[in-house]
Amino acid sequence: KKRLEKYTVRITKEIIDDVKTLLNFMGVPYIHPAEGEGEAFASELCRVGYVDYVLTEDMDTMAYACPKLIRNCVDKSLKRKDIVSIFDYQKMIDGLELSHEQFLDFCILCGCDYCPVVPKIGNITAMKLIKNYKTIENIIENTSSKYTFPENYLKMVNDAKINFNIFKDKINIDSLNLNTSEINIEGLKNYLINDIEMNEKRVVTTLKKYHNNYK
């Protein structure tokens, strides 16, 4: 546990403010919701057509019924830097021959942020069980002698379903506070070098690479 904790990052207000400052200098529009999971909020924005895609490495996002997900944009292990993975939610569940409710049960059964993994049930077994029994409730009723489900598992499942639908049909697009700004290359350069203390040569080289107007 201690070893894994070294790889975790606690998101503080200071980090959030730094990200906002960076986005402002870069001229990237952003929305900062007051509460809730970012993937949940972004997935609903995509579902209602406010954004075209959600960019994330967290595959739990598909459990929010995110219509279009882009992954591997920041995966440094990939040799090709011009390739990303795009997941189409509707095509995916159609290909799996699952309803949204069944796919959500499958995701929860595999283990997620809100529900633990059930011993001896991996992705392949979870899919077989969902295909056979359709719901987690039916799976528990018919296989409790074979699998050991955690205490209060059904309550955790129901809580997970609430969380995965937390923003569904609850975002008023007209009242969203979209923060916008013009790109400020000199401001960005000074911020990265003086405030973030990045190497000046690296900053200048990167800015020239990604912004043709920068001299």
What are the residue ranges of the model-derived segments?
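Positions that flank functional sites
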Residues: G38, T61, K208
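Short, hydrophobic/aromatic alpha-helical segments in well-folded domains
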Residues: F41, Y50, G122-T125
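Short secondary-structure transition/capping segments
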Residues: S43-C46, A65-L69, I130, N212-K215
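Noncatalytic, basic helical substrate-engagement surface that gates or grips nucleic-acid strands
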Residues: K1-G36, F41-L45, P67-L69
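Long, highly charged, low-complexity intrinsically disordered interaction regions
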Residues: A34, C46-P116
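Non-catalytic nucleic-acid-binding/docking modules located in mid-to-C-terminal regions
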Residues: I83-K215
